[in-house]
A protein has these predicted regions:
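Small/polar-residue-enriched beta-strand and adjacent coil segments characteristic
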Residues: 45, 58, 73, 80, ...
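Glycine-rich cofactor-pocket loops
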Residues: 208-212, 368-379, 414-417
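Extracytoplasmic/secreted envelope proteins and their assembly/folding machinery
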Residues: 56-59, 73, 83, 172, ...
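Post-signal peptide N-terminal segment of secreted/secretory-pathway proteins
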Residues: 63-85
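Periplasmic alpha-helical coiled-coil/stalk elements that build and connect Gram-negative outer-membrane
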Residues: 139, 148, 155-269, 380, ...
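Terminal intrinsically disordered/low-complexity segments used for targeting and assembly
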Residues: 2-64, 123, 147, 231-275, ...
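Hydrophobic, well-ordered secondary-structure elements that form the walls
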Residues: 307, 335, 352, 359, ...
Length: 458
């Protein structure tokens, strides 16, 4: 026994200097010094900044019934269970077994001693233990990889929650904007229809020829087509929102009347973006897992050192177990050095290194994409803010012109056509402003999501 123990110890010492240390992950891409627009990034309760209670209700409903969130959380639980399994790989294994053996020696065996029964019955009960010493850090690397998988699964679930909230908010503002556009189109059709009826009466009275009637009918028909397109856009936006929150087809959605506020979201500091976005944290965790698994693959090249032993009782017959049965035990340290496996370990190591390269590339792509998403949202917000300000000034000027035209009409200084043109211009400006207002709020949601929505890994 001492000779075997000494041999195992010498083998362990011979390979002790070969233990693998996982390589550090590559550095992230260089972050820009600053984004094109300063300001604090959105906080965790960013949705409340819009001042829309209906939006908050929709978010709560979506989180309760989203299959994407349920899938992400199930994968998170799976990763936690796999971590427990990986941690158990470094612990001793203990089992309890029993055996009942009956044997009979043939009388044809001439060497069978006389006076000894040819049939024997043996019963044994034994506890067996085995423990593979993690000298080279293989099991530790597997545990590190599993722990990184848990972090990646948690961050992925957080990203799913953020993406769901952003999409619900975006679709809700799209619904509100489409409803406003439909209201404008319905008003336009009603106006065109009244104008057509007025022209019909004028033509019937013989005051004008039929040419204006053809133009009026064409304008009314086009307004009806536009109204139908508006209804389709409302239906499409509402159906998309229903699917996201788990509502049944045709189920009524909230009828919000209060205007949604425009939050002053910023982008924060670029260097902090890596810590604020759960998808970037998940990509970094997957890279950590790949590095740890490369360490486990390298450890497969080194010998495994295992301690096995058993202890128990043996009796003949079985009734003597515990009543004078003979005890036995054994302890067997062993060293297993792999020599030839047709290139399996080399292939596994090469695959592990390729996974590191792939994970690093995905991480770099995610970081660069995050910077681009923030800058795109900032650029869109700047442009939409200018458009909203300009369109609001145009609408104010058109309304002033309409008021003046109506005053002149009452004073007999203008005709009805001047007022009609001013009303059409006012409706067009109001419709354009509505488009810009709701698109700007959708882009604000995009910026909140691009900057992490106030997420923290803590």
């Amino acid at each position: 026994m001492r000779r075997v123990n000494k041999t195992c110890l010498l083998a362990a010492l011979a390979f002790a200097g070969c233990a693998h240390e996982p390589a550090p992950p590559p550095a992230p891409p260089a972050a820009p010094v600053a984004f094109s627009q300063s300001g604090a990034a959105a906080e965790a309760r960013w949705a409340e900044a819009f001042g829309d209670p209906a939006l908050l209700d929709l978010l709560a409903r979506a989180r309760r019934g989203s299959p994407d969130l349920a899938l992400a959380r199930a994968r998170q639980r799976e990763a936690v269970a796999l971590l427990r399994a990986a941690d158990a790989g470094d612990e001793p294994a203990l089992s309890l077994g029993a055996v009942q053996e009956a044997s009979r020696i043939s009388v044809a065996n001439g060497r069978f001693p006389p006076g000894i029964p040819r049939r024997t019955d043996v019963t044994a009960v034994a506890a067996k233990a085995s423990w593979e010493l993690d000298v080279w850090g293989r099991e530790a690397a597997k545990s590190q990889a599993a722990a990184a998988d848990v972090r990646a699964a948690k961050f992925t679930a957080d990203q799913a929650d953020l993406a769901l909230a952003a999409e619900v908010a975006r679709l809700w503002f799209a619904v509100r904007g489409a409803r406003e556009q439909l209201a404008f189109l319905e008003t336009e059709f009603a106006t065109r229809f009244r104008e057509m009826e007025l022209v019909e009466r004028t033509v019937a009275a013989g005051l004008v020829d039929s040419d204006p009637l053809s133009s009026a009918k064409l304008a009314a028909a086009q307004a009806k087509v536009d109204e139908g397109l508006g209804r389709r856009r409302v239906a499409a936006a509402e159906n998309a929102l229903r699917a996201l929150i788990g509502a049944a087809p045709g189920e009524p959605l909230p009828l919000a009347r209060a205007p949604a506020a425009m939050p002053a979201f910023g982008a924060g500091v670029p260097s902090e973006l890596l810590l604020r976005r759960p998808d970037l944290a998940a990509a970094a965790a997957r890279l950590d897992a790949a590095v740890a698994r490369e360490g486990a693959a390298r450890a497969d090249f080194y010998p495994s050192i295992t301690l096995t032993g058993q202890a128990g009782w043996q009796a003949d017959p079985a009734s003597r177990i515990g009543q004078g049965a003979a005890g036995f035990w054994s302890l067997a340290p062993s060293v297993d050095l792999p020599l030839f496996d047709a290139g399996r370990r080399e292939a596994n190591l090469e695959a592990a290194r390729a996974r590191i390269d792939g994970s690093a590339a995905e991480w770099t792509k995610a970081v660069l994409g995050a910077f681009r998403e923030v800058e795109d949202a900032l650029a869109d917000l700047r442009e939409l803010a200018q458009q909203e300000e300009l369109t609001a000034r145009v609408l104010a000027a058109v309304r002033e012109r309409l008021a003046n035209a109506e005053a002149r009409l009452r004073a007999g200084l203008a005709n009805e056509s001047e007022v009609t043109v001013a009303r059409r211009d006012e409706a067009l400006a109001a419709r354009t402003l509505s488009l810009v207002v709701w698109e700007r709020r959708q882009v604000a949601v995009r910026l909140a999501a691009a900057t992490g929505g106030g997420w923290s890994s803590k």
